[in-house]
Amino acid sequence: MKKFIVITLCVLVFIGACINSNNSSVAPSDETANTEEVSDSVNTDTNEVSEKTWDFTSDTDDMDDSVNKYYSLRSDNFANFDFPYQGDSYLTITVRYMKKYGYDVLLNIDNGQMVGNEFNGTNYVRVRFDNGKVEKYYYSEPNDGSADCVFIKNASKFIKKCKTAKTIIIEQEFYQEGVHQFKFHVDKSLEMK
């Protein structure tokens, strides 16, 4: 099984090296689609602008009937990685509460692999909240070994900062793509229920 994984990884690295055009970039998302609204109403002064806030979802743990809570925020911009992760790659911050684990902070990339190694001390992201100083937050990898998600180690400090911040910038290195910055802006800071 290890031999198969190593061979597959080598093939992907080879293909990526052959196709690599070094044109990865972070581009703003197109939040304003080119659509035109047609209204029969005479009164058009009711332009409602929705506030950008953290998304909240919950579910019930069937084992102990406890409520799991998830607060998530998707980046305003995205990275456009080369093969095999082509397409818009957004970063998502998720604050998770589960009775059996407590509070966690997860960072998840849509397409791509986060690079960081605990042995070499490179398992961290750089984060800036509002106009504060840049801070390092070390992370752990998930138990399943996936590279698209990491768990922030000092979750309580990170959550405390999210409760007051309206702008967050996260910088992370990605496999064969280098370092990218993702920006998050909300009209309301994290409010936990």
What are these regions (language model features)?
Residues 1-28:
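Alpha-helical transmembrane anchor segments and their immediate juxtamembrane flanks
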Residues 22-193:
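A generic "folded-domain core" signal
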